[in-house]
Amino acid sequence: MKEKPTQYRLLGDENTSHKLVSACRHMVEEFSIVHIATWQGGSWLGLDDAALLISCAEAGLVLVAFDRATLPWHAGQVLRAGENHGGLMLFRRSVRSTDYGAQARLLTGFWTDEGRTWEWFNRIVYLPKTP
């Protein structure tokens, strides 16, 4: 079955576990997230970060990731090149990469409470948010 381009709003990158996607959908039925390996038949797997960020903007997707080291830098490079990215949500170091329940609670809570109404182009948010 083909995915509708507007069906999802969040894209879990290749270093984000499928278990996060499942946990989010368990907590919030029909939560608007898809993993990159299943989005459009996995055709986005292996894209360099800048190309992926630009592709996310074109598809209206916010990238969800753990890569705090390079993704913000790539997002800056995209902007300096005159392009847009679709937005970026990164988990802080305090969030364990294997604690899918905590990740899902942070992501679904933030998205449901406020994130889904935001304009995401060229925005970066770290979860958990600081007050």
Which role fits each region the language model picked out?
Residues 3-4, 8-14, 18-40, 50, ...:
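Acidic, PIN/NYN-like endoribonuclease modules and their adjacent C-terminal/linker elements
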Residues 49, 56-57, 61-78:
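Acidic, metal-binding active-site segment of PIN/NYN-like and related structure-specific nucleases
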Residues 2-5, 56-58:
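Flexible, charged surface loops at secondary-structure boundaries
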Residues 55-60, 108-112:
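A general structural signal for short secondary-structure boundary/capping elements
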Residues 45-47:
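Active-site metal-coordination segments of metallo-dependent hydrolases
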